[in-house]
Amino acid sequence: MLLIGLTGGIGAGKSSVSAALADRGAVVIDADAIVKELQSPGTEVFAEMVERFGVGIVADDGTLDRAAVADVVITDPQALADLGAIVHPRVHAEIERRIAEQSETANVVLLDIPLLAEAGWPGLLGTIVVDLD
């Protein structure tokens, strides 16, 4: 199995690359989608976030108010670190679970992880390609 890491900022073209490779048979594991799943109401992550940051991060419909979370963590380095401690280990574990699930059947698995280098993933990958303008 070829394991490819894809990273880049907003508007960098990650979605286009992911879609093109998926059209050619690659299995795409999207970290942002996993984060949203893990932060759904009723999950441990959601409960821990509400416990840490308060009910002000819950929207009227009971879902996570991402803008409210951003308002809290943007100016508070400790809050940002706490958010990372709640979310990142679970995302990492879920990505590893999905990789293992695909290891016997997939030829190519693409990890779409916006914070690939910052999250400590490069050691998992056999090849890293960087394109600088």
Language model regions located:
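Walker A (P-loop) phosphate-binding motif
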Residues: M1-A26, D30-A33
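Generic leucine side-chain signal with a strong bias for well-ordered alpha-helical environments
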Residues: L3-L6, L64, L111, L115-L116
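Residue-level recognition of specific faces of alpha-helices
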Residues: G9, V17, E37, V72, ...
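Short alpha-helix boundary/capping motifs
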Residues: G11-A12, Q39, L132
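Short, structured coil segments at secondary-structure junctions
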Residues: R24, F53, G123-L125
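Short, flexible turn/loop "capping" segments at secondary-structure junctions
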Residues: A26, D61-G62, G120
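ATP-dependent small-molecule kinase phosphotransfer cores
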Residues: A33-N107
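ATP-dependent NMP and nucleoside kinases share a basic, alpha-helical "lid"
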Residues: E96-E104, V108-D133
